[in-house]
Amino acid sequence: MIKENTYFEGGVKSLAFNQSGADVSVGVMAAGEYTFGTAAPEKMTVVKGALIVKRVGDDDWTTFQSGESFDVAGDSSFDLQVKEATAYLCEYL
């Protein structure tokens, strides 16, 4: 089953699905700034564009480009700065 999700008044849209027992989502973020909370650990991969990320405990912002990934701890949060529309893959670990 595919589930459509909309966050931040339409600024972020994703399609969530399960593949071989693993929950996954793919989506697009419009330019803007966002804070996401996590329940489970996540691996985020930038598909097209760039995400500027600051996770809990990080001192500095880090830019991840197309093809690059970053992990986020469960029961945590992370801040994002998006300069232009960016596509991503989120794997729930």
Curated annotation (Swiss-Prot):
Q: Which InterPro entries match?
A: Ppnp (IPR009664), RmlC-like_jellyroll (IPR014710), RmlC_Cupin_sf (IPR011051)
The reaction(s) catalysed by this protein are: a purine D-ribonucleoside + phosphate = a purine nucleobase + alpha-D-ribose 1-phosphate; adenosine + phosphate = alpha-D-ribose 1-phosphate + adenine; cytidine + phosphate = cytosine + alpha-D-ribose 1-phosphate; guanosine + phosphate = alpha-D-ribose 1-phosphate + guanine
- Please indicate which superkingdom the organism of origin belongs to: Bacteria
Could you say which EC number(s) this protein's record lists? 2.4.2.1, 2.4.2.2
Cite the Pfam families for this sequence: Ppnp
Keywords on record: Glycosyltransferase, Transferase
Role according to the record: Catalyzes the phosphorolysis of diverse nucleosides, yielding D-ribose 1-phosphate and the respective free bases. Can use uridine, adenosine, guanosine, cytidine, thymidine, inosine and xanthosine as substrates. Also catalyzes the reverse reactions.
Q: State what protein this is by name.
A: Pyrimidine/purine nucleoside phosphorylase
- The record lists the organism as Vibrio atlanticus (strain LGP32)
